[in-house]
Amino acid sequence: MLSGNGIRHILCAAALLLVAALAAAAPRVKPGIEVLRERNFAGLEGKRVGLVTNPSGVDSQLRSTIEILHDAPNVKLVALYAPEHGVRGDIWAGGKVESGRDERTGLPVHSLYGDTRQPTRKMLEGIDIMVYDIQDVGSRSYTFISTLGLVMRTCAEMGIPVMVLDRPNPLGGRKVEGSLVRDGFHSFVSQYKIPYIYGLTVGELARMINDEGMNRGQNGKLEPLKCKLTVVPMEGWERDMLFNDTGLPWILPSPNIPYAETAICYPSAGLCGEMYNYLNIGIGYTLPFATFAEQWVDADKLKDKLDSYHVPGVAWRTIHYQPISGRLAGKLIHGVQYFYTDFEAATITLTQFYVMQAVWELYKKNPFSGANDRLSMFNKVCGTDFVSKKFGQTMKVSDISGYWSADVAAFIELSKKYYIY
């Protein structure tokens, strides 16, 4: 029989072998920054370059795009532009990002999530081209794609070209869900008339909003502007790939998306999470967007109710935990964690609505009834008030599912014009 030390030695050796194997395996997908580098930075040579990025802008060896461009002898990186969470990712969700200087490079950093969300003309003085390199999460309400559009608008006004370094959509390139944004509901979290899950890479999306006249500002009411746009494509990416199929390391693009799987969970629970005092969705715990729980929930009853719906592609388990931070910090809460057994079959954005339906049937708790200061944000993120009104009346998924899917087929057809892969 092996001693405890012997077992530990074997486990350590196995772990080292696994690390070595992972290091030796080349990623299946080459992100845009690596393709650009292999092309000797074609399009940037001798130009003064601005860069919109955050910690997710790295190559497959974890080297930052900031450092890559800063050290390239034929590129002059002159300024950085900070989206939500900042260039170095040190600002919490919704926190104001200040302008200043990057400690590592000494470059000026202009905030695009502070006093203004669209770069001013003064911010762009002294650059010849703007580069964008941020890992997208594939959901309309994540603010990075809105920042991209506003950057493209100012660049269009000033005649400055934009180069997007493409990256994988972690939800793949085939899943499309949700209604288009309705007039009157455009905002920084629903800036374009696209579905909630749009099934495009950020480079493909940039081409679409540029060519289809969708870049109409935060409120969707401005005249569309078109910039001179170049997309540096990936190599090896295919539409049916989820992020873990790419072989690339996942670098959290924001604090609550720590794992590639969390990008799938975000659209599955994030809308529900906008109703802040309703259900905990794992924020403040180790499973952001992956749970639905509260102190007053009977986990077994909730799971049994959800099982009775036979939701395609979704499985549930009971969970009991104490959030580490937030309004329920240190309190024991109970509920369910969900898993996708068939990602293709699942309509992931409806997962949260099945949970809300079950909670209504068990506890008669309706997050949309009465005065609620979060309802406006829910509608903005949803891109419509139809869902909150209709679902709030009946609390039945079947009463909104047709509306939610009505725009999908036409959008997929439009998208095909902009497919790079």
Identify what each model region corresponds to:
Residues 76-85, 165:
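Short internal beta-strands
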Residues 292-402:
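Conserved functional hotspot residues or short segments at active or partner-binding sites
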Residues 97-127, 139:
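Glycine-rich oxoanion-binding loops at beta->alpha junctions
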Residues 19-21:
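N-terminal signal peptide c-region/cleavage motif recognized by signal peptidases
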Residues 185-266:
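Conserved anion/nucleotide-ligand pocket segment
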Residues 88-93, 163-186:
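Glycine-rich, charge-decorated loop segments at or immediately adjacent to ligand/cofactor-binding or catalytic sites
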Residues 236-319:
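Glycine-rich, aromatic-lined ligand/substrate-binding cores of catalytic
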Residues 136-148:
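Glycine/threonine-rich flexible loop motifs
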